[in-house]
Amino acid sequence: MEKVIAKTYAKAILERNDFENFYSNLLELSSAFASNKFIDILNSYEIKQDKKLELILSLLDNPSDAFKNFINLIVDNKREMLIPEITKELSEQKASKENTFLGQVYSKEKLSEEEIKNLEEKLSLKFNAKIRLDSKISDNDSVKISLDGLGYEISFSMQSLKAKMNEYILKAI
């Protein structure tokens, strides 16, 4: 349900002329949600909505009146905890609109910038879209590339390669 609500807000923001301003403000606010104290304050029933609104707006340098009204609407509807989800959804819709997709590369070791750029170029050609990849470290020996926006995932494991080579050699004998 929260994802549907966040999509609705994100879609409305994406159609605005001052979209970039909204997006940068939401990115700033989303970073505050990393603090447990901030979340506790927003979840508190003892703190009035107008104080929560004041706190949220105090995190921004000179927000526009339109953005203040947007945050006021969010707080009035008790949806302030959706701000990170709205930001995430807005980021995904923005990427989709610009034909840019974000993905992750999971590997045992962090990949170099050159390796990531090479993968991005090859995947961009394959999907006819701009692909951005983040390198993440995982525990297993496999390499996995995941592009959620495109529904694409590929995994390559040394163990499976060795097993296939053994099978091929045994068939050849």
UniProtKB/Swiss-Prot annotation:
It is a peripheral membrane protein. GO terms for cellular component: plasma membrane; proton-transporting ATP synthase complex. It is found in: Cell inner membrane. Keywords: ATP synthesis, Cell inner membrane, Cell membrane, CF(1), Hydrogen ion transport, Ion transport, Membrane, Transport. One of its GO terms (molecular function) is proton-transporting ATP synthase activity, rotational mechanism. It comes from the Bacteria. The keyword Cell membrane applies. The keyword Transport applies. F(1)F(0) ATP synthase produces ATP from ADP in the presence of a proton or sodium gradient. F-type ATPases consist of two structural domains, F(1) containing the extramembraneous catalytic core and F(0) containing the membrane proton channel, linked together by a central stalk and a peripheral stalk. During catalysis, ATP synthesis in the catalytic domain of F(1) is coupled via a rotary mechanism of the central stalk subunits to proton translocation. Belongs to the ATPase delta chain family. F-type ATPases have 2 components, F(1) - the catalytic core - and F(0) - the membrane proton channel. F(1) has five subunits: alpha(3), beta(3), gamma(1), delta(1), epsilon(1). F(0) has three main subunits: a(1), b(2) and c(10-14). The alpha and beta chains form an alternating ring which encloses part of the gamma chain. F(1) is attached to F(0) by a central stalk formed by the gamma and epsilon chains, while a peripheral stalk is formed by the delta and b chains. This is ATP synthase subunit delta. It comes from Campylobacter lari (strain RM2100 / D67 / ATCC BAA-1060).
